[in-house]
């Protein structure tokens, strides 16, 4: 059988694309091939004996318009739940001392005056007393220094050519503004690492201003984000011309005589389609010969690992868990971020890491298993909080080798994103996913946005 559309990837980008194709053209024949034994990709709500937690994507914010629209369409909008964006920095040099962070606060007012509205590009020297006063008013004297340091870098960037910022990392650019000690402090206290060293400065600054800004309200979905996947799947399978196959790892894509032939590993069966839509990360696409002409564009996106470690802790003699009252933390050891989830059930995200820190945890887990993870967690949590830490009842490690994509140094993200959507005009080959989003990379919104653009190209 020849399908009108073959979609490679059963994550949210692939399912959302199929959903919109069928909305506009209900009789279209569609085949979705997913390499795992389940749909969802990096949206995965883990449900086990000890906890129900987000193994992959976790939160979204008020600017994620397409996601809000989708949640309403799927009848999930009543489950949207506000979460506090506030966080504190816990330096290991002073265990138990927590410093506030403006970058995660919601109630500090607008910072737009720092970006626009002045009618000119203000100098760092001019703005320093203004935003220093602003930070003191918002946070008092215990504000975390990295907020001021990061904003000094952002302000300094406003007078720089875009091409310069695209060709250096955030920390490389920061060297022109800050001292080595200040840069080291940012690297230690800013929870995310890849944004500082992997992303080009232009896109990293955009991410900080638009997605990590304290003005955004953040949310989670009660019951888990996997409900989005389940709802989309249930709507898709109602159409008689769609087929969804899991455990189908694509080995090769061939194009000849205006049609695509898809070969899967360990299967003699091939699949034929008129349109091929690839909703998979760059690392997958780079293996296919058909994408070699645009490999130089795919190389502009650097996929880096993420690792979430959740633990359930026992209650003490007083009936409370050790992390009672603990705020969300960033810290300058291998934990990087610590996020309490449910004090009543004793659930905490004991570590959330990216880049080299995520790899280190995964290597430890592969070598020493859960006991090794627990030993390391107890040591680092005590180092960070100054509290006595009991042995966890259970810990789960969720490691993603390609957690999210980053626009790398040298990338013109606007151009590359546009080019990769329909990379070779002579064939009906398309790409979508958060990885390829110009302005919403690293968010579910990016998957939906690139899918929407693809649908527009198809002109259904």
PLM regions with names:
Residues 254-255, 262-321:
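Central helical "cap/lid" subdomain
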Residues 135-249, 256, 289:
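Active-site/ligand-binding neighborhood in enzyme catalytic cores
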Residues 3-32:
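N-terminal Rossmann-like FAD-binding beta1-loop-alpha1 element of flavoenzymes
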Residues 16, 24, 259, 331-460:
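Conserved flavin/dinucleotide-binding core of flavoenzymes
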Residues 22-48:
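Glycine-rich FAD pyrophosphate-binding loop
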Residues 94-104, 251, 256-260, 264, ...:
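Charged, often glycine-rich, active-site loop that binds/positions anionic groups
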Residues 51-140:
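Dinucleotide-binding Rossmann-like beta1-alpha1 core, especially the glycine-rich loop
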